């Protein structure tokens, strides 16, 4: 694919995005104008105000749950912070509506940030319990701190925004403002997916371990997502208070957080459009079914259950999957793509070391998985780690990439001590990694998977959209998958998924590439292709440290071999030296494997 072709492809994508944005803005203007100028009954106005303000809060759950995969069972608490800030600000403290709303959003944002900072390392059901506790605590405060919140009696006469002096917005105009806010928030949340932060969130959701090694600050990303979720909760709550002019603690209980969660799950947690759809259904469906009188709640509950059972990804997820099934993505035919710069450092064949490991140990209680290992990897060489199963090879790679903290020892990458750096920081220093068991971001496209690798910290192409796309396509072209860039990664065969994982690592232009059994699970044809790819990488001067049990593969590409057994280094040298070493033959190769190809 030539530069012109890449530009044309990118230009077509940009054109579609601009068209979609134009249509979205047009629909927003028409909807806001309709709400502003069409007389509606008080009943309908209240329903639509509730739906629009709830939808803003539920869009926060799209970010934290749908995009990032973190549970939040306290969205009603953040909603209440915004609501009570507007309610008390405009009544007790005499603030205008807008400053009170800003205060509410700020309080929700701060509360979400603090809660995220202190609890997101827990994850799973522990995080769920923390958010439930926060929700319960805040509900008790709202009910019992009567001097401030007015307790169970609630707050009345909440002021709306004033346009001219004492003229406050009526319900129709206020509804138009809420709908405009919903369209604005929806636009931002929709486009968040295709930003660097959005891809980082989705990577954390799909595979947190791989995300960290690829260069994403997983903890920081989760905290940002949780904070944004709380911010939108507070924003929606503030607008809600202005819409109804009365609030009380029983509107913001744990049960309401469950309602918010149900809304996002029914509509489809990974799509803002699905979120709005789910919110509308849960608010409007009971009203539509009221003609059934005594049985309408049973019908309503049954409808919700059926949606959850038969559409586990929500209504919008079901529709999207059906659309992709009926309209599979088409491949584009690449021409000549500019060669991939495998590394942005100046290649040096002077024998200097890119990696120095000194007395490295990793103990799990009494088990010495890695025990005082010394390792030196020369620049622009292929260094193989071999040994029997359980010898500590993968554990060593996990320590090198920061997944495990060493018990003792030192790791230097390109003359920088990285022993105590986090995985994403080591990626920023130029360390790339693949896994024995393929770890891709399963719900992202192939090109987005590789783009995450290219956006590692300190990478020269990160943040430059056109150059980033060209670089990512070049990485895919290097492994032979450029024509499938826009397909779902889950549609690929096992062997092709292995190539995508390698392309993701290459896209980061690593100084050192760690490959953990890249040939595992491949058939003969795929393995021959892998050998050819590794030879090309070696020919480009990329420094590689590889683990593999296929000695034919190792002999063909390795310049140096280190052998581990029971966590200790037992041999090291050229393939000819190591594979004839009696200790290696006895520990790993067996007596029948003593000849080495010239």
PLM features: residue spans?
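A generic alpha-helix propensity feature with a strong bias for hydrophobic helices
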Residues: 42, 99, 155, 164, ...
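Pre-NBD coupling/linker segments of ABC/ABC-like ATPases
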Residues: 318-353, 459-470
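Transmembrane alpha-helices and adjacent helix-loop boundaries
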Residues: 2-337
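Glycine-rich phosphate-binding loops of nucleotide-dependent enzymes
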Residues: 351-356, 362-598
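Residue-level detector of alpha-helix boundaries and kinks
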Residues: 33, 122, 186, 287, ...
């Amino acid at each position: 694919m030539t530069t012109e072709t890449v530009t044309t492809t990118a230009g077509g994508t940009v054109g579609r995005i601009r068209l979609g944005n134009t249509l979205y803005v047009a629909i927003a203007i028409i909807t806001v104008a309709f709400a502003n100028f069409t007389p509606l009954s008080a009943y309908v106005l209240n329903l639509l105000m509730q739906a629009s303000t709830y939808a803003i809060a539920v869009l926060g759950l799209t970010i934290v749950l749908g995009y990032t995969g973190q549970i939040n069972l306290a969205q009603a608490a953040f909603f209440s912070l915004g609501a009570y800030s507007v309610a008390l600000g405009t009544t007790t403290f005499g603030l205008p509506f807008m400053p009170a709303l800003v205060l509410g959003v700020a309080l929700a944002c701060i509360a979400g940030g603090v809660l995220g900072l202190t609890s997101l390392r827990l994850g799973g059901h522990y995080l769920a319990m923390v958010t439930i506790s926060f929700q319960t605590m805040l509900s008790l405060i709202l009910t019992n701190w009567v001097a401030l919140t007015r307790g169970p009696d609630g707050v009345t006469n909440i002021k709306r925004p004033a346009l001219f002096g004492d003229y406050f917005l009526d319900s129709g105009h206020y509804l138009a403002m809420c709908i405009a806010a919903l369209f604005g928030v929806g636009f931002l949340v929709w486009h968040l997916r295709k930003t660097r932060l959005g891809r980082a969130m989705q990577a954390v959701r799909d595979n947190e371990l791989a995300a960290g090694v690829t260069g994403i600050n997983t903890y920081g990303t989760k905290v940002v997502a949780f904070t944004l979720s709380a911010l939108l909760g507070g924003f929606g709550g503030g607008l809600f208070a202005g819409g109804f002019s009365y609030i009380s603690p029983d509107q913001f209980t744990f049960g309401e957080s469950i309602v918010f969660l149900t809304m996002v799950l029914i509509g489809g947690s990974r799509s803002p459009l699905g979120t709005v759809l789910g919110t509308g259904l849960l608010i409007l469906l009971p009203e539509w079914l009221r003609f059934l009188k005594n049985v309408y709640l049973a019908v309503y509950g049954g409808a919700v259950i059926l949606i959850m059972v038969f559409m586990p990804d929500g209504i919008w997820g079901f529709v999207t999957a059906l659309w992709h099934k009926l309209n599979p993505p088409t491949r584009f035919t690449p021409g000549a793509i500019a060669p991939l710069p495998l590394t942005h450092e100046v290649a040096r064949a002077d024998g200097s070391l890119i990696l120095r490991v000194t007395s490295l140990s990793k103990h799990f209680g009494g088990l010495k998985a890695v025990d005082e290992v010394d390792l030196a990897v020369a620049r622009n060489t292929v260094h193989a780690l071999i040994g029997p199963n359980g010898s500590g090879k993968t554990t060593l790679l996990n320590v090198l990439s920061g997944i495990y903290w060493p018990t003792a020892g030192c790791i230097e990458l390109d003359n920088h001590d990285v022993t105590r750096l986090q995985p994403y920081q080591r990626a920023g220093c130029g360390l790339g990694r693949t896994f024995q068991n393929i770890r891709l971001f399963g719900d992202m496209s192939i090109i987005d998977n590789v783009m995450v690798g290219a956006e590692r910290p300190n990478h020269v192409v990160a943040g430059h959209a056109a150059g980033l796309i060209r670089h990512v396509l070049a990485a895919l072209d290097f492994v032979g998958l450029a024509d499938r860039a826009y397909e779902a990664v889950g549609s690929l065969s096992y062997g092709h998924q292995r190539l995508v994982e390698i392309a993701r690592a290459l896209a980061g232009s690593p100084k050192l590439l760690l490959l953990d059994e890249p040939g595992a699970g491949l058939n003969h044809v795929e393995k021959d292709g892998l050998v050819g790819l590794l030879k090309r990488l070696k020919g480009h001067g990329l420094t590689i440290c590889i683990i593999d049990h296929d000695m034919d593969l190792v002999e063909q590409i390795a310049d140096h071999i280190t052998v581990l057994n029971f966590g200790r280094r037992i041999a090291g040298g050229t393939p000819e030296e190591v594979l004839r070493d009696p200790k290696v033959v006895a520990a790993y190769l067996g007596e029948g494997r003593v000849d080495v190809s010239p």
